[in-house]
Amino acid sequence: RFYIWVIRGTPLLVQLFIIFYGLPSVGIMLDAFPAAVIAFAFNEGAYCAETMRGALESVPQGQLEAGYCVGMSWWQIMRRIVLPQALRTAVPALSNSLIGMIKDTSLASNITVAELFMAGQRVAARTYIFLPIYCEVAVVYLLFCTVITKLQGLLERQLNAHGFQ
């Protein structure tokens, strides 16, 4: 709970800076890209953990009790009863987290990770053509997010087709 409280209570940009600029003060040197990956993993891990906790808690206790009554082990109950229902509940929120993370990758440019937004900034600074370039960057982000949204819809339909209500 402490990890989730700290990560959810601090901005991702601060987390990036602590990992990239702060860890060298205690002898841990990381290049920019691995530092960004670690920061994003810790950040998304906290949000996804809370999403999954909520999804698991949404499955009625009676479902577990019914599984025990028919002789299932805890692992069988989780795999065959609880997780399919929890996943159906969690997919929209997990997809939203993924979309948020895709958009947040622009923050990695603050620690010199060359990503989409930084590439747009470099081109705009070189050509002095700002609005069209930033609009193109926005369209690329929009396309990424649209693909994730479509995949989420397919996954939700697949889960619904299997009767996980």
Q: Where are the regions a protein language model picked out?
A:
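Transmembrane alpha-helices and adjacent helix-loop boundaries
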Residues: R1-Q165
